[in-house]
Design a protein with these regions (language model features):
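Primary mode marks residue(s) on the alpha4-beta5-alpha5 output face of response regulator receiver
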Residues: 37-68, 72-174, 181-281
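Sec-dependent, cleavable N-terminal signal peptides
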Residues: 1-36
């Protein structure tokens, strides 16, 4: 009996180990799925030239901000704290297609105390989930994104700054909420999807991502990467965010979204909608 017991014990242990390994694989698979939150379908994308750096935030009242920090502005060329939707619609814009009228802004950043100057902004509007359920972003939507990641040159996206990056440029990418309450344009009316879909009472809108392209000052990205916050403070990179004043409801933009985004992911994209090369994302 002792001999039998000695033979059965390893078998039992092997069974336990195999079960534990299976659980780990399932957990790992779930983590990989969660990391793929931003996977999107067909995309309409364009670029915007850098406009200016200023203490500007038209959303300061909605966000409860008392001390406006320095932001880098793209898109609408005359953005002020007092700007209006009408001003954006009628004003000059630095983005590629003439029908783009939105404004985009984000805090400036430094690495090891040296300012990193923005080269340009890339903007992406993408389909996701069941594209037949997507609705247009409401005119005047005030979108606030705090979900950021980083890329060094053509390298893969990562969740933390790519310190030591020696490419000519690095990017900070910000992802925006993709679910709308249907009840106005205040930043609180837009929330992130959960478990691959919008919560009850929310409608899915195109998934938006912006990528700010920066010159790699000094030829290498050094610690610490800090961003402007408050009146004259610089904070940890985790304070990074971006804002969009979305006024793109004119015919040209609507047509681009319907042609490039509001369609099944398994249909071919028109050439004008195709994503650029990987190192441009």
């Amino acid at each position: 009996m002792v001999a039998v017991t000695r033979l059965q014990l390893p078998v039992a242990l092997i069974g336990i180990l195999l079960a534990s390994l299976l659980l780990l694989l399932v957990a790992f698979s779930g983590a990989r799925t969660a990391d793929a939150t931003h996977r999107s379908g067909n995309t309409f994308q364009f670029g915007c030239d850098f406009v200016k750096t200023d203490r500007i935030d038209p959303f300061k009242d909605e966000l409860g901000i008392t001390h406006v920090h320095r932001h880098e502005v793209f898109g609408y060329r005359n953005l002020q704290n007092s700007s209006t939707v009408t001003a954006l619609l009628n004003g000059a814009n630095s983005c590629g297609p003439s029908f783009v009228k939105a404004a985009y802004w984000n805090p400036l950043n430094t690495d090891a105390g040296t300012r990193n100057m923005p080269r340009r902004l890339s903007v992406y509007y993408s389909g996701w989930g069941d594209v037949n359920k997507l609705v247009h972003i409401p005119r005047g939507a005030k979108l606030y994104g705090t979900d950021e990641d980083f890329r060094c040159g053509a390298g893969q996206a990562r969740q933390t700054p790519p310190y030591g990056c020696k490419a000519d440029e690095f990017r900070i990418r910000v992802h925006f909420p993709e679910c709308w309450s249907g009840n106005g344009v205040h930043p609180r009316e837009f929330v992130e999807a959960n478990s691959g879909g919008c919560a009850s009472g929310y409608e899915p809108i195109p998934r938006i991502r912006v990528a700010v392209h920066y010159r790699n000052s000094g030829g290498i990205l050094r610690k610490p990467l800090r961003v402007s916050a408050g009146a004259d403070r610089m904070e940890n990179w985790s304070f990074m965010h971006a804002d969009i004043w979305e006024v793109n409801r004119q015919a040209g933009f609507r047509n681009a979204i319907e042609r490039c985004v509001f369609k099944s992911q398994n249909t071919g994209e028109p050439h004008t909608c195709s994503p650029p090369a990987s190192n441009q994302l």
